[in-house]
Amino acid sequence: IIMDTFDPKHIYSDAAKLARLKDKKLFLFDIDGTIAVGDTLYEGSADLIRYINDIGGRAYYITNNSTKSGLDYVKKFHDAFHLDSTEDQFITSGYMTLRFLKENYAEKKIFIAELRKNGLHVTEVCEENIDCVVVAYDSELNYGKLTEVCKVLFTQDVPFYGTNPDLRCPIDFGFIPDCGAICDMIT
């Protein structure tokens, strides 16, 4: 059942929709802008997730947010949403980018900061022999960082990847520029 067609605030009053849920065991949810914004769950989301657990289902969460790890989301779901979860329930764009880079650039030099802690050789300064450039959402983005990325891309023939194509990220007051907007600005 897609969240756009299922109104979770009526979960306990709509018998037909409840019956459809009982046959399902796997549920995939986007987080930001779908079941939550910031540290606030949308009305009915917690009830729906608890109901899924009650019927023996399993919820997985997919997000384009590359700034948080699966463990960060476990903590957020516990502390902010009062929901129990495990790290394997979260698939982030950062995690998927990491998997891609480990498979394709394990011994190469990568221009990004966040992947160093996962065993990849990364750099945040413009230097020769960079093998690829990866751009992610960056809340501390500045002109200096943009200049460094552009210098690498214009002086070296390297692939350029973004962790997600989203132009904007939903937050409590509306939207802010996301990875896709940063990538568009660079290109």
What are the roles of these predicted feature ranges?
Residues 1-31, 35-187:
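HAD-like aspartate-dependent phosphatase fold
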